[in-house]
A protein has these predicted regions:
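ATP-binding N-terminal substructure of ATP-dependent carboxylate-amine bond-forming enzymes
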Residues: 1-114, 145, 330-331, 348, ...
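A conserved helix-loop-beta module that forms one wall/lid of the active-site cleft
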Residues: 104-170, 188, 192-195
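Conserved ATP-binding module of the ATP-grasp superfamily
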Residues: 134-136, 157-160, 177-212, 243, ...
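Short beta-strand-to-turn element immediately C-terminal to the catalytic PLP-Schiff-base lysine
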Residues: 141, 171-176, 221-223, 287
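Phosphate-binding site of ATP-dependent enzymes
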Residues: 184-237, 257-264, 281, 285-293, ...
């Protein structure tokens, strides 16, 4: 199929996302979204087959959407679909391609320089440092020796992470007794072969100071470099080496002055990166509970169903507002949340699943909107080291952030995953906690 076969494509998506297509199905007419994806990913993920059920899909075309160094010639060689009005990244690895296509076609977008910064945590650290945005001490890591030296200089603790991955993949919190050589090997080999093309830019790594404090994210709609909508999400993470999220709550219950500080910090980051149009998902640690320090920032919509929580709390559709903005129009924006919403991820013992019970009971609890369990009998529950490995989640609402969070936690506690061979130290389903 060629682009000329889908002249009615309104939206071009750089990188295939089933979740995003599902959301667009409720917003756009049939045959209005063209997906561009790496040929390798199309084949491995069977994208043509899996995307066929989405009414909004106009077609799937092979394109080098993950060749960030070649983004400009890729965009120059891609015929512009008739009627296209917006380009969006479907996945983290499509952020640069989306910006390049928007620039080539004269459409609002992130801006290619900003997209490149946001796809590289090392470049983001440089940009934040130049703008005096508070952040942890850090350095590029080329091997285990760099990590060991940094840890020794920072009190025996550090964070090791890839500079250009997603979903907490390869991120490790290291203490004084952790084996640096083994940790480096785990981070350097972490990959997503069904999501990331083999020719994509090589991995780079950084080591950072470990900061303590509550962790939040700020979701921001940006128009002409100016933030027009802010949301603050509270997050909790699992304890241990791998800081994978256990839950999110919208809106975060914070003092007004802390919210103001986050707004100011995010505005400074927008200016520092030169971001033009679209949505940003910035993560921050509140040092001493009040002072925002930058963790990282993505030039795309948030994952973990945070967009759903924002829609439930604020009303309307964050995605629809982003599309309106990317078409050069001004979206109607909510002034304040009308309720709260929360997501809580399941935890489970490690081993072969014998049974899953309690899902119906969880779904019947007042305020619970969604229960999804990703494991079943005879399946396997492994240790959670990244976001893809979590065994399920619950979404709930409430009049307040506390009420929504407590409802989600009760629902998770009602679900039991029984395994045949527990791994020593594993937690029972529904009992995991921990906060950044």
């Amino acid at each position: 199929m060629s682009v000329m076969n889908v002249p009615d494509a309104r939206v071009v998506m750089a990188g295939y996302s089933a979740g995003l297509l599902s959301d667009l199905d409720g917003l756009l007419p049939p045959r209005s979204v063209l997906v561009l994806e790496e040929p390798e990913i199309i084949r491995v993920r069977r994208v043509h087959e899996r995307a066929a059920d989405f009414a909004c899909l106009a077609g799937v075309l092979p394109a080098a959407t993950q060749d960030e160094d070649g983004a400009v010639p890729m965009a120059a060689g891609m015929p512009r679909p008739e009627g296209v009005r917006a380009v969006i990244p479907g996945v983290e690895y499509g952020v640069v391609a989306a910006a390049a296509l928007a620039a080539e076609w004269g459409l609002p977008g992130a801006g290619l320089p900003a997209a490149r910064i946001l796809r590289d945590k090392l470049a983001l650290r440089d940009a934040a440092a130049a703008a005096d945005i508070p952040q942890p001490a850090w350095r590029t890591a080329y091997g285990a020796g760099d990590v060991a030296a940094f840890r020794a200089a920072h009190g025996g603790a550090c964070v090791l992470k890839p500079a250009n991955r997603q979903a907490s993949l390869g991120v490790q919190l290291l203490g004084p007794d952790d084996d640096i050589g083994a940790a480096w090997a785990r981070t350097a080999t972490a990959d997503e072969p069904t999501l990331r093309a083999a020719h994509a830019i090589p991995g780079r790594y950084l080591v950072e100071q470990r900061l303590t404090g509550p962790e939040v994210s700020v979701e921001t709609l940006v128009r002409e470099g100016v933030p027009v909508f802010f949301n603050i999400t509270a997050k909790s993470v699992q304890p241990g080496r791998h800081p994978v999220e256990l839950g999110h709550v919208v809106p975060a219950d914070l003092p007004p002055q802390t919210g103001d500080a986050l707004h100011a910090a995010m505005s400074s980051l927008i200016k520092a990166t030169g971001f033009e149009y679209g949505i940003l998902h910035g993560e921050w640690i509140l040092v001493d509970g009040v002072s925002p320090h930058l963790v990282e920032c993505a030039g795309r919509g948030p994952g973990d169903s945070i967009d759903t929580l924002i829609d439930l709390a604020h009303g309307g559709s964050l995605l629809e507002r982003m599309l309106t903005l990317l078409q050069g129009e001004t979206p109607a924006l909510p002034q304040a949340p009308v309720r709260a919403a929360a997501i809580r991820f399941l935890t489970a013992p490690h081993g072969r699943v014998r049974d899953v019970t309690g899902t119906e009971r969880a779904a019947e609890l007042p305020g619970v909107l969604e229960v999804r369990v990703a494991v079943a009998k005879d399946g396997n529950v492994a240790a959670v080291t990244n976001s893809w490995e979590r065994p399920g989640h619950v979404v709930a609402t409430g009049a307040t952030a506390q009420e929504a969070a407590e409802t989600a936690e009760r629902a998770v506690a009602a679900i039991a995953v029984t395994v045949a061979d527990d791994v020593q130290g594993a937690t029972d389903a529904g009992t995991g906690d921990g906060a950044e």
